[in-house]
Every structure is written in C-alpha cells, then in structure tokens.
Amino acid sequence: MLGAHFPPPPLGASEGRAAPCTFQIPDGSYRCLALEAEESSSEDGLQGEVRLVDLEEEGTSQSRANHGTPPLSRAPAIIQPSSCHREARGGFQRSDRPSHDWDVVQARKVMTASGSSSPVPRVAQKPALGRSTSFTENDLKEAKARSQQIAAQLTTPPSSNSRGVQLFNRRRQRVNEFTLESRGQRSPKLNQEALQTGRPLSPIGHAPGPSVKPTSPSKPGSPKHPSPQSPSRGVAGHIMEGYSEEASLLRHLEKVASEEEEVPLVVYLKENAALLTANGLHLSQSRETQQSSPNPPDTEVPSPAADINQNPSSPNATLTTLASSSHHSQPTADINQNPPAAITPVPQNSSQAQCSPNGTLDSKPGTLCADDGQSPVPAEEVRSSILLIDKVSAPPSAASTFSREATPLSSSGPPAADLMSSSLLIDMQPSTLVAPAEQEVPGHVAVTTPTKVYSEVHLTLAKPASVVNRTARPFGIQSPGTSQIEQSPMMGRRQFGEKAWAPPASSMADRSPQPQRHIMSRSPMVERRLLGQRSPVLERRPLGNFTPPPTYAETLSTAPVASRVRSPPSYSTLYPSSDPKPSHLKGQVAPANKTGILEESMARRGSRKSMFTFVEKPKVTPNPDLLDLVQTADEKRRQRDHGEVGMEEEPFALGAEASNFQQEPIARDRASPAAAEEAVPEWASCLKSPRIQAKPKPKPNQNLSEASGKGAELYARRQSRMEKYVIESSGHAELARCPSPTMSLPSSWKYTTNAPGGFRVASLSPARTPPASLYHGYLPENGVLRPEPTKQQPYQMRPSLYALSPVKEPAKASSRATSSRTPSRTVSPRAASPAKPSSLDLVPNLPRAGLPPSPALPRPSRSSPGLYTAPVQDSLQPTAVSPTYSSDISPVSPSRAWSPRAKQAPRPSFSTRNAGIEAQVWKPSFCFK
C-alpha cells in the first residue's frame, strides 16, 4: 500500500491532469454505468459492480480488471488532486464505503469542479460537470427507465421462471438492501453480512464502504473499533460491503437523479448533489450502524489500520471511516496512525493507492492528512472526531450548508477534547475546500489542507456545496471558481462567524496531495488550534442542532440535497441553511407562506362570491314589482284599447292573465262615465285606484263580515280570506274575466276568493294583487290576500265546486232579489266607479276579486247549499248577486259553456257592463262577502 501510495508524486503531477482525469463526463459515464450495471446487468452484477467501482475510483474502466495496485496508481492519477482526495474523504465522511466509491467519482468531479487546489480550475471544470451532467442525466434517465422496467417486470412476475427475471430480482434485492444502507436503515445488517461474507463485492473502492460503516459504529465506540471493523472483514470484507454500499449508492444516485431531473440545476447537481446525497445517506447509515451495531465495529477492531485511521481521523472520521475501514492494507492504516512521519509521504501514496484500489485510498490521503493534523489529538479525541465527522459528514452530504450543522453535531457529540478533534474535522467540513485551519497556519496550511481537504472533500461530496456556490453565487455566498472550497468556508463562516476563511484559497492551492501530506504532519497542530478556537464556536451554535443532526443529516441527505438539486430557490433557502436548521426551516416556511397566500386568495374569492349573491337577491325582489307594473300597464292599455266584448273574448282565449286585463277594461267600462279616467288610468288611475278602492273597501269589509257570518265554513274559518275578498271585491268586474283562467287554474282562483265564486277572482287577484298592493291603498290587504289565498286554496276550491251548479239558480234568484238593492248600491259604486275603473286598471286584482265575489255569491250559496245553501243564497245573493248574475249570465253564456265557474265569473262582468251595474257588481261582491 505504501509503495502504491508513494507514487503520490504522480499524484502531484496528476493534479494538473486531475481536472482531465476527473472529467465530469467520466463521472457521468461512471454514474450511468453504475446505474446501468446495477439495474440492467443482473447477470453481470459483480462485473458491473467492479466496473462501477473502477469508474468511481479511476474515473475510467482501467481498474475494472485490476482492483489491486495498478488501479491504485491510476486512481491517484485520477484522484491525485488534493481536491479529489478531499472529496474522497468527504465521500467517506458523508457516506460510508459505498459513498466513498461515489466520492472517488466525485473526487474526479471535484477536480473538474474545483480544478486542482485552486478555485479557478474548479470553475472551469464546473462547465465540464454541467456537460457531463447532461450526459450523465441522460444516462441516469435511461438507467432509471431500465430499472423501472426491470422492477415492473420483477414485480409483475415475482415467481417468473425466466433467468433474466431471477437475476433482476436478485439484483433488485441487493440494490434495495444497499439503498436502505445508504439511507442508514439497513446498514447494520449489511455491515454484519459483509463481515460474515468477507467477500469483496468489488476489490476496488469497496473497502471504503465497509470502512465507512465501521467508522459510523466507531462514532459510538472508541475510534479503534470503527477501524477494526474493516480489518476483521479484511480487504475482501471491506470490498464486499463497500461494493454493496456502492451499489446502494448507485441506486440512491439514480433515485436522486430522478428527483433532481425536476429542476434545471438537477443536471449539474445529479453528479454533485446526487453523489453527495448518496454519501450523506451512507454516513447516516454509518451513524445508524454505529448506534445500532457498534459491536461489529468492535469486532473489526483487530485491524491496526482502522485504529490508526481513527486516531488521526478525527477529521478523517467522516472520511477516515472510509479510510480506516476501507484501507485494505493495514500498513496504510498504520501509516495513517503515524501521521507525522509515515503519513506525510504515505498520505499521498495511500491516497493514491487507496483511491485506485478502493476509491477510499484517495480519500485516505485526506484521512492521512487528517491523521497528521489530528494525530496529536488523543485517541479519545480522534474517536470523538470520527463520531463528529460521521455526523458532520452526513449533514455535509445533505448540503455543504449543513456541514455547519454536522460540524456542530460533531463538536457537541464528543467531549471537549473530542470537540476539538471534531472541530478540526468540522473546520475541514465548514471549509470543506477552504480548510480554514490549514489556511490559518500558513506553515501547516498545506498539511492541514489534506485533513481539511478531506473534510472539504466531504463537503465536496456534498457537491451541493459546489452547486450551492453556483446557486448561492447570486447571493454572494460563494464564488463559482472557489465554490467547493469557499462554499464550505462561507458556510463555515456563517456557522462560526468568527473564523476567517481567507486561508481557504491557499488551502486550495495547497491541496495538492504532496504538499498536503507534508503539511499533514503539521496540520494536527493547526487543526487543533482551529479546533480549540472554533470548536467552542461550533459547539455554541450547533449545540442546539447536535441532538437532531444524525436524523437531520439523514433527512438532509435524502431530502434537502434533493431540494438543493431541485432549484436555486432551494439554494436560497439553503443560504440561511448555513445553519442546518434555519435552511431546513426556511425551506418549509416558504411553502407555508405560499399556502397562506393561496388561502387568502380563496378567502377573497369567497367574499366576492358572497357579494354577488347579495346582488342577485335584490334583483329577484324587483322583478315581481316590475312584472306587476308591466301587468298593470298592459291591463290599462287593454282597457283603453279593447271593448267589453274584446275583453270577454280575451280571457277565454288567453287565460287568466288576459281575463285579468280585460277585467280592468271592464272596470273602465263601468267607469265609462269618466272618460278622462281612461286617459288618465295608467298613472292617474293608479293614484285614483287607491282612493276608489278605499271606498269599496269598507263595503267589502261589511260584506265580508256578512259572508263570514252567513257564508260557508271556509269563510267563517278564516276571516283573513274575507278581508282579502273584500279587497278583491272591488274587482268583481275583472272577476268576470276570471272564468277562463279559473278553468285553467280553478284551485288557486277559487280559493283566493272568499266567496265560492271568489276563486276566480283570487286567481286573478294573486296575479295582479302584487301590482294592486304596490299601487293601491289595498297594498297591505292585497299583500295579506296573496299569502293567505295560497293557504286558503283548498277551501276556495270547495266553494267553487259547490258554486258550479248553484251558480245559475242563485244568479237568477239573486238577480231578482238583488235588483232592488243593486240600484241603490250601484249608485255609490257608480259614483266611485269613475275612480273604480281606474282603480281596476291599477288594481285589476281587486276588481277581479270583486267580480268573483258577485259570482261567488252563488258559489257560497252553492257551497252553502251543500252546507248553508238556503240561507246564504237567500240572504247574500238577493242583496247583490241577482243583478250581477242576470247580467253576467247573459254575457257569460260563453263562460257558462266553459263551466259553471266560468259562467259565474262572466256574470258579474256582464252585469256590471250591461246594466252599468258596476256598482251592482261591487255591491253583490260586498254583500255576498
């Protein structure tokens, strides 16, 4: 391993080419290949895994065949840039071994994104990431479609006999398990399985995954325990678990990419944020593994490399977990343990060797750097730092912004000493690319840079950092060139506020593996200083977040990263999320505000609707009035234009309305003495009608009292009907017109009239009563009449039935008996008649009502014949009905043809017209009522 790592000078050399090596396109191809290999090549599962691992570690397919030293040498070339190593470390930190594979790929990305150690190359490489992302995005889409198809096939025929389906099922199960691991749900089981199996899923870069898991357990346990986990498994064990995690990472990346596809930034973020998310998930897994299964890491304690890594890996913890667990060769781990002497050269070598074989090796240099920087830190401190790093790494995976959260978590998670070491890691994380501690100490900047670069790599793994830089760039948070390095520093600044991140630029320049290695021996001091300086700050701010961070980091790794990927707005949300909670809260708060806006708009709409409803109601009310006015005007016009005969004809032909209008003209005929009124009637008649009606009212009242006393049970039962009839009694002439309508509407018309014949009038009166009520003094009476008639309808119907046959008899008898009274009463009605006709015009309902009462006299007699027939007919009909009926009968003969009811109504109208008995008609109705 050392020999393999010593090629680091090539790493330094390859840093220049690191950008080329870390082509975003290779990353995209790697991801696509990984996804495709996992999803589509069930038969080539192992080969695909190896191929994926190779792509991750080497950024090429060179390491597919060679998982050993040659891939290691290649890997250094790919990952040689310190940024690559950092990223690999970040991958280890954020995600366990599987995430390290991603990290290796990301290391290339970092090199492309962040160039070598300087931000400018990163900027230049970002476009490459964007391009490769487009390709990768397409590949991811294709892989996703394939996986979906495969999943659908597998789901539909779970027990299918086809070999392909079986292979897919196996592959799917494996992937699901890995995915769960990446999510941190099944990491313990996978770790145990990997330990038990001990088979290298992919010789290259698989160890980091298992190592990450041990590191996660190491978090709860002593630093040594996490590293032993990988030793117990051995290189093969680490590779197996790492590969499984890599597969899970690939699955996770696929999912993330699918999620990220939603937003244009997704293309860029898929490579960056997707891998970061997967890494963060692996870190969450490792955390869960640590918490749930710290013993397996203890079991792995035997590996000295892991122990060594953990001692120096407080910064490594996130990444060191990968390095320690993933260090296939214990010597490398030992080198890590010896950060001052061996680590300085070895970190480069180990980073190269580790990156090439494990993909962790690359991160291992970062680990070594961390070890150098942190080797002075006590084992407890290192262990705590590992725990912190794990926590931190998960949040950074979620987002570079969350790196602060992770840093506080680490600081709060371990003791004060641990906080220092974790602070070192935290510093690395906040300054992921900046390596503020390294930068702070210029002599140690290079050395610390590797350690912090490792943490930075973790943030870099949370490529959201670089992505965030692009998006955050508008906010002025980070410059696109130094996005990775400065992003975490900026985030770190927000976290710590105190720390000056000016060094980050130098740290970027110092990231070259060799300088970093040399500095790595010094970095522990610098990092310690930074930790001593910043750890309190980290503790202060993140302490509130410390407890939630693991879950929060997991949540962030799964969701917040996706949100970042989804849109710059999410980044803006993340901008405040430099404090992990605030960013998350902001993301949530914004939707809440939007929801409130929607509710407000809905409320406004509701109020508008209510207003419209109010408008509608008033409209409904005036319509009846308008109808009444129109009816009255039409009646007046008809009265003027049409003669009595025409009036009679109309009711038969037209119906109730026509008869009503004709009745008004009949009233005019009655009022024929007042020709002026005919001219006046439309308006003046309206005014006069109330006067005239007022005169008849008292008469109807008397008649009503009589009718109630003498009349049928219906009238006696309800005096209100009698009152209505009294009001309507004025319109007896119009009632004559009612017969035809009564035929059509016998019930309503009949019942409306108190008198048996009044039903006709009632029908007319209700139709016109509104106008009469509106225009006439009757108005209250008419209004009462309207509702009451509806109630009285059945009763009036009865009188109408009774009145049908008796109408003729009572009409004749009453005509004779009433002849004497009619002249006298007629005189007064005639005197009033001039006005009355106008009133009829205005209040056709009243005259109508009046008319039917005259015929109604026979009706009450009819109804009363059944009930009180003899007395009622004799008393009431003789008074007024006889003349009305005699006159009505002659003209009403047509109405008679219609029916006895029709006969009744025409009688009053005719009697009033022919004999000028309008007064008689009025009198009979009044007398009858």
Swiss-Prot record:
GO terms for cellular component: actin cytoskeleton; bicellular tight junction; cell periphery; cytosol; dendrite; dendritic spine; glutamatergic synapse; perikaryon. GO terms for biological process: cortical cytoskeleton organization; positive regulation of actin filament bundle assembly; postsynaptic modulation of chemical synaptic transmission; regulation of long-term neuronal synaptic plasticity; regulation of postsynaptic cytosolic calcium ion concentration; regulation of stress fiber assembly; spine apparatus assembly; visual learning. InterPro entries: Synaptopodin_domain. The modification Phosphothreonine is found at residues 547, 769. O-glycosylated. Residues 208-221, 317-329, 567-580, 812-839 have a biased composition (Low complexity). GO terms for molecular function: actin binding. A motif (PPxY motif) lies at residues 549-552, 568-571. Keywords: Actin-binding, Cell junction, Cell projection, Cytoplasm, Cytoskeleton, Glycoprotein, Methylation, Phosphoprotein, Synapse, Tight junction. Expressed in brain, namely in the olfactory bulb, cerebral cortex, striatum, and hippocampus, but not in the cerebellum. Also expressed in the podocytes of kidney glomeruli. In the hippocampus, mainly expressed in the principal cell layer of the dentate gyrus and Ammon's horn. It is found in: Cytoplasm, Cytoskeleton; Cell junction, Tight junction; Perikaryon; Cell projection, Dendritic spine. The modification Omega-N-methylarginine is found at residue 848. Residues 54-77, 111-243, 280-382, 395-416, 497-520, 539-595, 688-714, 805-912 are annotated as: Disordered. The modification Phosphoserine is found at residues 134, 202, 222, 258, 488, 512, 567, 672, 689, 740, 744, 765, 833, 854. Residues 146-164, 282-293, 330-339, 346-361, 398-413, 872-893 have a biased composition (Polar residues). It comes from the Eukaryota. Its main location: cytoplasm. Actin-associated protein that may play a role in modulating actin-based shape and motility of dendritic spines and renal podocyte foot processes. Seems to be essential for the formation of spine apparatuses in spines of telencephalic neurons, which is involved in synaptic plasticity. PANTHER family: PUTATIVE-RELATED, SYNAPTOPODIN. Synpo deficient mice develop normally, but they lack the spine apparatuses. Adult mice have an impairment of spatial learning in the radial arm maze test. Interacts with BAIAP1. Interacts with actin. Interacts (via PPxY motifs) with WWC1 (via WW domains). Belongs to the synaptopodin family. This is Synaptopodin. The gene is Synpo.
